[in-house]
Each structure stands twice: as structure tokens, then as C-alpha cells.
């Protein structure tokens, strides 16, 4: 099986690494080695890898920029594929097709520079378009579902195009959340004409707010927990006296209790233990069971 993988990589010019530390490919900077890490540069290469993995029965996982991901300390005994960044293609003046591996924050800036509204909320979000579609990423009153009109994914049955309605978007979830074997290849967004200066000012404001309120100076996976109905996870955690709570190198941020940060040398086990501690304490004191937003690579 591994011989076929190496042959495919050689034939298609795909960069293939053996034993690459996943800590270098996640924003948490945590994780042991991947047996194989593939870095395709095109959608065709990504599809070829997915098809080979399925044919050969390879245990595999697809990641973007690892911004909401916790990789195991023991690593990943299989193939990790990172989605290619590629480049957006404008289909008309307001409609753009964007590869799954493209930066959400970069797309937001690109749209604003062209005077197009609908994605300013994504300024500063460290994830990719694919991850954003999967979890219906959002902030400051905006979310992916506001502008996404379609996406194309790779499924075990072949390529499939989904309309906006077929994504079944909800808070931090989509149809992709329920079908982990559907891999987003690209999305199509329809934006609205806006005032360029106003959009750039809005983005600058969002950026300043993030820097002021979020612990961007430490590695993390963003918000550790989903927002419970009618509540804020960070506020509940703070009210339970858990700001600054620490397990090993993992800590509930003192700046924003909704974040778990890597203070240095944190392990996956540290983070998972801290998540459980926070869940248990918050549920005991408030009756609310917090649902993690961080995904664990399996």
C-alpha cells in the first residue's frame, strides 16, 4: 500500500513526508509524527490521493491549516493530507470559486479590497475555506452560510456538487459535519457590492477587537467550546472560577476564558484533561454541558 502511495507521489510530483511532526501543521503546535504527510498543490492531486487511500484501505485524514485541530501525542498512523491552497477564480464580478485550502482571512481581505461585502467577519479567522464551510464558521454576526451558494466535494461515490440548501447549515455545523468522508474541494461564494473604505475599516475594527480580547500571543485552536444556547461559554467558564486553570502546559486563557492555550510544552493529553475538567466543573455549577469546538485527529 505504501509503495503505491510513494509511486503516486513520484508520478504526480506530490510532496510526501514521512514522520513529519503534526505540531508543525496545527496552530496548537501539539502532536506527534504522521506516518505519511502529503502536501498536494492542486485539486486533481488531492483527488488522486483520496482515491488511492480508498482503493488501498489506507487510514487517512484531511486537514487544512490545523486551526481547530488537536493532534494526538502519539501522532497519526496513516496518511494525513493537507488541502492545497490554490487560488480563487472569479466567475463574474461578485461570484468567486475558492479552493478548500485557501485562507478564510485572506479571502475576506481580497473581497474587501474589491469592494465586495459579505466576508468581513472572517478577518483574522486562521482557518481555511474548507474548514469554514464544514463548521459554518462565523463571527461578529456573519457566517459562511450567508454567502456560500454551492460547494463541490469528493465522496466515496465520486464528486458531488451541493447547493446552498443542501449544506443544511446550523450553528457551527453543516452536512459535512455528519459526513466526515465527504471532503470539500472548493466553494462558490456570491458577494454584494459595498463601499471599499467602509469594508476595510470594518475589518480593521474586527482585527483590533480580536487582538484586544483574544490570546493571539499563544498557540491555540481558537474557541475551545461551542456557544451554548442563550449563553457564552467563556462567561460560564469565568463565572466558575476557571480562568487561568492549568493542566500541564495547557491553560484556560486569563485573557479570554473561552480559549485553551499552549503555554509551552502542552500535550494532547493535557488539553483533553483540561477540557474534561472545565466541562465537569461548569456542568456541576450551572447544569450546562459545554460541547468542544476543537476536533481531535483520529
Predicted regions and their residues:
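Gly/Ser/Thr-rich helix-start
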Residues: 32-33, 65-67, 76-79, 102, ...
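Phosphate/pyrophosphate- and phosphate-bearing ligand-binding catalytic cores of soluble enzymes
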Residues: 17-18, 26, 69, 154-273, ...
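Anion-binding (especially nucleotide phosphate/pyrophosphate-binding) glycine-rich loop
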Residues: 2-129
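Structural signature of FAD isoalloxazine-binding scaffolds in flavoprotein oxidoreductases
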Residues: 31-32, 37-43, 70-88, 134-164, ...
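Hydrophobic, well-ordered secondary-structure segments
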Residues: 104, 108, 122, 126, ...
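Residues embedded in well-ordered beta-strands within globular domains across many folds
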Residues: 80, 120, 152, 294-295
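A generic local secondary-structure boundary/capping motif
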Residues: 69, 108-111, 119-123, 136-143, ...
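Short, basic and Ser/Thr-rich N-terminal targeting/leader segments
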Residues: 56, 63-65, 147, 218-219, ...
Amino acid at each position: 500500500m505504501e509503495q503505491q502511495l510513494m509511486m503516486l507521489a513520484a508520478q504526480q510530483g506530490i510532496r510526501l513526508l514521512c514522520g513529519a511532526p503534526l505540531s508543525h501543521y496545527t496552530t496548537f503546535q501539539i502532536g506527534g509524527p504522521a506516518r505519511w504527510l502529503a502536501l498536494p498543490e492542486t485539486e486533481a492531486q488531492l483527488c488522486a490521493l483520496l482515491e488511492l487511500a480508498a482503493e488501498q484501505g489506507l487510514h487517512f485524514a484531511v486537514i487544512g491549516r490545523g486551526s481547530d485541530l488537536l493532534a494526538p501525542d502519539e501522532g497519526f498512523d496513516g496518511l494525513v493530507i493537507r488541502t492545497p491552497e490554490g487560488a480563487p477564480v472569479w466567475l463574474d464580478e461578485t461570484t468567486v470559486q475558492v479552493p478548500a485550502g485557501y485562507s478564510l482571512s485572506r479571502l475576506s481581505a481580497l473581497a474587501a479590497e474589491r469592494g465586495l461585502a459579505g466576508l468581513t467577519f472572517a478577518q483574522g479567522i486562521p482557518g481555511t475555506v474548507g474548514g469554514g464551510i464544514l463548521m459554518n464558521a462565523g463571527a461578529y454576526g456573519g457566517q459562511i452560510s450567508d454567502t456560500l451558494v454551492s460547494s463541490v466535494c469528493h465522496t466515496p461515490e465520486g464528486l458531488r456538487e451541493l447547493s446552498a440548501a443542501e449544506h443544511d447549515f446550523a450553528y457551527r455545523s453543516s452536512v459535512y459535519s455528519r459526513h466526515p468522508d465527504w471532503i470539500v474541494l472548493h466553494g462558490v461564494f456570491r458577494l454584494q457590492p459595498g463601499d471599499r473604505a467602509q469594508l476595510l475599516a470594518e475589518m480593521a475594527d474586527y482585527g483590533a477587537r480580536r487582538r484586544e480580547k483574544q490570546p493571539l500571543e499563544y498557540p491555540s485552536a481558537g474557541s475551545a467550546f461551542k456557544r451554548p444556547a442563550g449563553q457564552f461559554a467563556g462567561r460560564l467558564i469565568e463565572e466558575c472560577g476557571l480562568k487561568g486553570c492549568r493542566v500541564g502546559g495547557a491553560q484556560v486563557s486569563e485573557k479570554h476564558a473561552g480559549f485553551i492555550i499552549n503555554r509551552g510544552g502542552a500535550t494532547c493529553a493535557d488539553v483533553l484533561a483540561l477540557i474534561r475538567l472545565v466541562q465537569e466543573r461548569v456542568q456541576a455549577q450551572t447544569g450546562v454541558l459545554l460541547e468542544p469546538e476543537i476536533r481531535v485527529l483520529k
